[in-house]
């Protein structure tokens, strides 16, 4: 009795499944993008991502482990020399699956699985408290100059007034944010 595998079975025995995934991975690395069924693509994704991780490591042992799965030396060479440097900055997520519709004939869901070779763009990280108070503090600060321009005041009074206003608006904005958070938590 064959050992059960994780995920849907692809037909045939375990050896046939391994060979099918190896051939799909070889085609993916050779063409950078392939069109296949959704089930096969979902089973291929972890295999391909593991092979790319080996290629990023780049040592002889990693190359031999990949050669144990993909028999084509030219595809393994391309994986280690061309694909691995392009995804060197990326921490996982080397493949993308895009749904294409249904196949004519058996109505199987078709997808396109492709390598993500675009350079990674780092996300700007910020804390929740600073992002919540920044827009609230910016809005009252934007209104303060409008109020000052409507009322003519001596320059010395205006300078003293502006020194007090940002501190007051910041405190008020922080109090509003805390009140809004308290109202949301009560609901």
UniProtKB/Swiss-Prot annotation:
UniProt biased composition (Acidic residues): 145-157, 165-180
Gene Ontology biological-process entries: translation
Gene3D superfamilies found in the cross-reference section: Ribosomal protein L17
Positions of the UniProt region annotated as Disordered: 122-187
Pfam family of the protein (one): Ribosomal_L17
SUPFAM superfamilies: Prokaryotic ribosomal protein L17
MF annotations from Gene Ontology: structural constituent of ribosome
Listed InterPro entries: Ribosomal_bL17, Ribosomal_bL17_CS, Ribosomal_bL17_sf
Keywords linked to the UniProt accession: Ribonucleoprotein, Ribosomal protein
The keyword Magnesium is annotated on this UniProt entry: no
GO cellular component: cytosolic large ribosomal subunit
Biased segments, Low complexity type: 127-144
Domain of life per record: Bacteria
Family: Belongs to the bacterial ribosomal protein bL17 family.
HAMAP family cross-referenced by the UniProt entry: Ribosomal_bL17 (MF_01368)
Assembly and interaction partners: Part of the 50S ribosomal subunit. Contacts protein L32.
Protein name: Large ribosomal subunit protein bL17
Organism lineage string: Bacteria, Bacillati, Actinomycetota, Actinomycetes, Micrococcales
